[in-house]
């Protein structure tokens, strides 16, 4: 699919259905975990198990939550320069409610994507006013603004490990009317238990990372004024 001998081009973003099915064929073990987690939500399980669906959107009262498969091109030999398929990314963006805040949920960070993939993905995120990306993978916290446009919050290791890694979790809040919020990080400090990380921000309250998004109406007005 990708690489020197692959056909994939981020500008068109097409991944052939046969390849999507092949890429998803080896996930039986993962699907069994999903079936247990979402035992009361069979429709969610079907989204994960669909042989042709790479990404999908779950709409709640206030949010569009996009489950973005960032591991489709991952191998032991290819752990960076990943792709998500910009055509299926466009398809799932087109399903969102423009008046709700959209959140991308992935395993890998935006930084792990191929440079061409990053460029096209950023253009699509701008077009659809997507300004929040939540990722895992890193066994530490990483909170930042990407490309002077969207916020990416990366965290997600609850297993105690030795060495430089930390068992930590990010907890946030978001005001759906003001379109702003904040994040705090809690890390496991044995034997004292969960402790707030006191130094995750340069704001006056160093233990809280604050952020603000542009709401859809403001963005629409800016575009209209340019046109």
List PLM regions with ranges:
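His/acidic metal-ligating clusters that form di-metal
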Residues: 52-152
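A short C-terminal boundary segment appended to hydrolase-like catalytic domains
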Residues: 174-227
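Short beta-alpha junction loops
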Residues: 2-6, 108-109, 138-139, 189-192
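A structural signal for well-ordered alpha-helical scaffolds and beta->alpha junctions
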Residues: 27-34, 82-86, 118, 165
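Extended active-site neighborhood of metal-dependent phosphoesterases/phosphodiesterases
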Residues: 1-79, 124
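Conserved beta-sheet core of the metallophosphoesterase superfamily
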Residues: 1, 17-26, 111-183
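Residues at the C-termini of beta-strands that transition into short coil/loop
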Residues: 2, 69, 156, 187-189
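A short local loop/turn or secondary-structure capping micro-motif enriched for an aromatic residue
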Residues: 74-76, 161-162, 190-193
């Amino acid at each position: 699919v990708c690489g020197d001998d692959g056909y994939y081009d981020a500008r068109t973003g097409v991944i052939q259905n046969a390849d999507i099915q092949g890429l998803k064929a080896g996930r039986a073990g993962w699907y069994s975990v999903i079936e247990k987690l979402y035992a009361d939500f069979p429709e969610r399980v079907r989204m994960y198990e669909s042989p042709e669906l790479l990404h999908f959107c779950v709409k709640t009262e206030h949010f569009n939550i996009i489950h973005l498969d960032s591991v489709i091109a991952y191998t032991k030999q290819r752990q960076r320069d990943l792709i998500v398929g910009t055509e299926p990314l466009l398809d799932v963006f087109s399903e969102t409610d423009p008046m709700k805040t959209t959140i991308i949920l992935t395993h890998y960070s935006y930084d792990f994507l191929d440079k061409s993939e990053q460029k096209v993905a950023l253009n699509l995120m701008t077009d659809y006013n997507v300004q929040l990306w939540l990722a895992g993978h890193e066994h530490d916290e990483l909170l930042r603004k990407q490309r002077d446009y969207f916020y990416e919050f990366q965290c997600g290791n609850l297993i105690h490990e030795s060495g430089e890694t930390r068992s930590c979790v990010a907890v946030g809040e978001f005001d759906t009317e003001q379109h702003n919020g904040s994040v705090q990080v809690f890390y496991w400090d044995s034997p004292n238990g969960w402790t707030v990380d006191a130094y995750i921000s340069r704001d006056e309250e160093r233990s809280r990372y604050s952020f603000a998004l542009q709401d859809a109406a403001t963005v629409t007005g800016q575009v209209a004024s340019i046109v």
